């Protein structure tokens, strides 16, 4: 009985110790769950990028593994061409069309003339027609230079427009002379001589015409003996200069003569020096 009682007591004590340990563990876990550890600013941030240095043993191991997994395939011409064709097909698939075909015909429609010609074709066409200037034919110049033809054409156009201007001027001159009743002058004078004259050259030069009424008023004044007297045609300003002005003029003449003499002396010196140098 004594042995059985001792064994039971040992079993009870062991169970109690296990329960105490379990309670301690549970209390610790509850503390971790409920309580938060305060943040300490002194902690340093860990660098997320870790430096990994490969040792020569690891390099050798990786090389051996890659050699075992990948074996080089011998390249042939057929394989190179197939690879090039596949790459070309992929490029064509990726490439997009810039425009969508409408189905209309391209280029200039038939029957229309192209306005762009070269200078050589123009010269050939012009020379095939022949020269239109008779004085060139007399000089036996069948194919004159291109620049010469252009100058002749410009001269012909200039003369034509000058002749039209002359006809227009004659027409206006006839109408204006008929209005002024000067139609007889047209038979005696040419248009070229009349061109540089005014239409009213035959009349008085001054625009204000003197009337006979002013002459009558002058005769009446002479008869009535007025205080006003008419001055005769005499030169008011005298030609004699005063004494001071004559002195100034003499001084100016002297200074001019002195300046001329100095210039002559300097020229003579310069010529003498040049002769000695030569």
From Swiss-Prot:
Residues 43-53, 88-99 have a biased composition (Basic residues). The modification Phosphoserine is found at residues 23, 138, 234. InterPro entries: TAF1D. Pfam families: TAF1D. It is found in: Nucleus. The keyword Transcription regulation applies. Component of the transcription factor SL1/TIF-IB complex, composed of TBP and at least TAF1A, TAF1B, TAF1C and TAF1D. Interacts with UBTF. Component of the transcription factor SL1/TIF-IB complex, which is involved in the assembly of the PIC (preinitiation complex) during RNA polymerase I-dependent transcription. The rate of PIC formation probably is primarily dependent on the rate of association of SL1/TIF-IB with the rDNA promoter. SL1/TIF-IB is involved in stabilization of nucleolar transcription factor 1/UBTF on rDNA. Formation of SL1/TIF-IB excludes the association of TBP with TFIID subunits. This is TATA box-binding protein-associated factor RNA polymerase I subunit D. It comes from Pongo abelii (Sumatran orangutan).
